[in-house]
C-alpha cells in the first residue's frame, strides 16, 4: 500500500526544483500520485477495504487541490508535470 522510503526519495530527486526541495507542488503531486497508484493496486485485490478507499479519496482530493494551485500559478510547469506523470489524456 504505502510506497517505500527509497522509492519516495527517487521521486523527490526526480521532480525537485532544486537541491533539498521536498515541498514544492511538483514533488508533492508526484509523491501523491505514486501513493494513489499503490492504493489502486491494493484496492483492486481488496475490494472491501473501505478504510483504504477513504484514504485514497483524501489523497486524490489533496492532489487535485495542488494541481489546481499549480495550474493557476504556473501553467507551463503544470503542463510539464501532467505530461510526465501521465495524468490527463
Swiss-Prot record:
One of its GO terms (molecular function) is rRNA binding. InterPro entries: Ribosomal_uS15, Ribosomal_uS15_bac-type, uS15_NS1_RNA-bd_sf. GO terms for cellular component: cytosolic small ribosomal subunit. Coiled coil: none annotated. GO terms for biological process: translation. Gene3D superfamilies: 6.10.250.3130, S15/NS1, RNA-binding (1.10.287.10). Keywords: Ribonucleoprotein, Ribosomal protein, RNA-binding, rRNA-binding. One of the primary rRNA binding proteins, it binds directly to 16S rRNA where it helps nucleate assembly of the platform of the 30S subunit by binding and bridging several RNA helices of the 16S rRNA. Belongs to the universal ribosomal protein uS15 family. Part of the 30S ribosomal subunit. Forms a bridge to the 50S subunit in the 70S ribosome, contacting the 23S rRNA. NCBIfam families: S15_bact. This is Small ribosomal subunit protein uS15. The gene is rpsO.
Amino acid at each position: 500500500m504505502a510506497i517505500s522510503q527509497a522509492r519516495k526519495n527517487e521521486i523527490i530527486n526526480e521532480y525537485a526544483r532544486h537541491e533539498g526541495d521536498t515541498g514544492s507542488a511538483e514533488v508533492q503531486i508526484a509523491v501523491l500520485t505514486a501513493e494513489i497508484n499503490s492504493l489502486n493496486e491494493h484496492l483492486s485485490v481488496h475490494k472491501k477495504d473501505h478504510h483504504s478507499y477513504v484514504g485514497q479519496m483524501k489523497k486524490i482530493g489533496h492532489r487535485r487541490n495542488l494541481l489546481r494551485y499549480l495550474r493557476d500559478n504556473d501553467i507551463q510547469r503544470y503542463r510539464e508535470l501532467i505530461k510526465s506523470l501521465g495524468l490527463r489524456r
